A protein has these predicted regions:
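Amphipathic alpha-helical coiled-coil segments
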Residues: 1-3, 126-152, 160-162, 167, ...
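Bacterial Sec-pathway N-terminal export signals of envelope proteins
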Residues: 1-47, 92-114, 120-127, 173, ...
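Acidic, low-complexity, intrinsically disordered peripheral segments
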Residues: 4, 19-21, 205-235, 241, ...
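Small/polar, glycine/serine/threonine/aspartate-rich low-complexity segments that form flexible
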Residues: 14-90, 94, 225-238, 269-274, ...
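Hydrophobic, small-residue-rich alpha-helical packing segments that form membrane-like cores
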Residues: 84-97, 101-191, 196-205, 209-212
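Short beta-strands and strand-coil junctions in structured, solvent-facing domains, enriched
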Residues: 98-99, 216-217, 254-256, 270-271, ...
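Acidic, glycine-rich loop-and-beta core segments that form the ion-binding/anion-interacting portion
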Residues: 171-238, 242-270
Length: 446
């Protein structure tokens, strides 16, 4: 706002007053001849001055100024009571070589406006990144909760098998070695369950802190969210990798910031080159005095004075300016390389997220098959165990493998969903509204 304010009329006003008292021994010849004494004389007066002005800075480098001045003197002693002088002065100055041109004069204003645009783009990017961060943290809490539930279900299944095998042991159908293996498996599953509870509570507390809540506050997580992402979370974006990289280059606001900064550095080169030119300034001045009768506020336009001049300055020591010019050239090259590096990093991020989604989708397919296989293994092991024909090791392995496969299945769903959110974010196609809801891509919404 200040840079814009500089190009509006700026008004000024000033004033001041002084009181003066002078005393001096003035020898008066006649009085000395009569009395032989000197006479003490004193003078008192009040001086006041006022000034009103306006200044308008032109975007071409020139400046227009208008000032109205008044000087007023009032004598408190003597015959003359008061005197006053004033003038209306108008001036125009315009650089003709150095500092000439709107691109030079308005550089600070343009840079300030572009810096504001950069901050708006950065804030938009931050909103997208923060939304993905909150969603990722939320899904991680859901994953830890589902892991805890799976470990608890596995513990119940192990305890049920242990009770059955202990009953067989009491009948002499199982040995202590066989039952001990199942007891050890139950203890390990209990340990995994308690550890998963700790991780779940810690992740939930971290999520509260991220939302600005206190860790001791209670919040309820939506149980339907995991079902929802399980049903829709494995959908793939409707575009290929080449299209994704092209979209990222075209839509990423932070990449536009990098490109615009290259243009900023190019302008700085022109400004630095202009600073090495000689100084040649044109000045036009008009002065209208007040009327000779001494009345304030009356101007004598017939006796106005006009003047014009050129002020030339030939720079002989340009070491500092030449260093600034070289620095501007270097900054331009740095900005260009940073822009190209940002473009490569954006493409690399898109490729990495594309691979993560594919890997998560492949993991999902493998883990889904693994869950189905281990469910059949557990079912068969339970049937054989109930008939007294089962093997303890088969029972332990099938149940542990089922619990691990169920946890890995949920983990692959969460990982794919988070990767997809980050993918849309890095493509610049994740839109966040004022309520915090986001829209992915074109037709996918949340």
């Amino acid at each position: 706002t200040f840079d814009r304010y500089r190009y509006t009329p700026v008004f000024s006003a000033s004033g001041g007053a002084d009181y003066q008292w002078d005393a001096e021994d003035q020898f008066v010849t006649d009085m000395q001849a009569l009395t032989g004494m000197s006479v003490l004389s004193a003078s008192e007066r009040v001086d006041a001055s006022t000034s009103l002005g306006a200044r308008y800075l032109l975007k071409g480098g020139g400046a227009i100024a208008l000032n109205l001045t008044n000087n007023f003197t009032r004598f408190l002693t003597g015959d003359v009571s008061e005197l006053g002088t004033g003038a209306l002065i108008g001036s125009f100055t315009q650089p003709l070589l150095r500092d000439f041109g709107s691109y030079i004069e308005t550089e600070n204003l343009m840079q300030a406006e572009r810096d504001l645009l950069y901050r708006l783009r950065d804030f938009t990017r931050f909103r997208k990144t923060f939304a993905v961060r909150v969603a990722s943290s939320y899904y991680s809490v859901l994953l830890n909760r589902e892991t805890t539930r799976n470990n608890y279900a596995g513990l119940l299944a192990n305890n049920l098998s242990l009770e059955r095998e202990q009953a067989f042991q009491a009948e002499g159908l199982r040995t202590l070695l066989q039952v001990g293996r199942l007891e050890q498996s139950s203890l390990q599953q209990d340990l995994r369950w308690t550890s998963s509870i700790t991780r779940y509570k810690r992740s939930l507390d971290d999520f509260k802190i991220l939302l600005g809540l206190k860790a001791e506050e209670n919040i309820a997580l939506d149980d339907n969210e995991m079902i929802l992402i399980s049903e829709t979370g494995m959908d793939s974006p409707d575009l290929n990798l080449e299209q994704a990289m092209d979209l990222a280059v075209q839509t990423r606001l932070d990449l536009y910031n990098g490109l615009d900064r290259v243009q900023d550095r190019a302008r700085k080169i022109e400004v630095a080159a202009n600073a090495m030119k000689p100084g040649l300034d044109l000045s036009l001045v008009a002065r209208v005095p007040d009327a000779n009768d001494g009345d304030l506020g009356e101007l004598d336009f017939e006796n106005a004075l006009y003047s014009a001049g050129l002020d030339f300055e030939l720079p002989l020591d340009t070491k500092l300016d030449r260093n600034s010019y070289r620095r501007a050239l270097i900054d331009y090259e740095v900005a260009t390389r940073n822009y190209l590096l940002d473009m490569d990093n954006i493409k690399l991020d898109v490729v990495d997220l594309w691979r993560r989604m594919n890997q998560a989708r492949k993991n999902y397919e493998i883990n889904l098959t693994s869950v189905q296989i281990n469910e059949r293994r557990v079912e068969e092991a339970e049937l054989r165990a109930e008939l007294g024909l089962g093997d303890i090791q088969d029972t332990v392995d099938s149940q542990n493998d089922l619990t691990a496969a169920q946890t890995d299945l949920i983990s692959s769903i969460v990982d794919h969903n988070i990767s997809k959110l980050e993918f849309w974010r890095d493509l610049g196609l994740l839109y966040v509204d004022d309520s915090g809801q986001w829209e992915e891509g074109v037709n996918e919404s949340r």
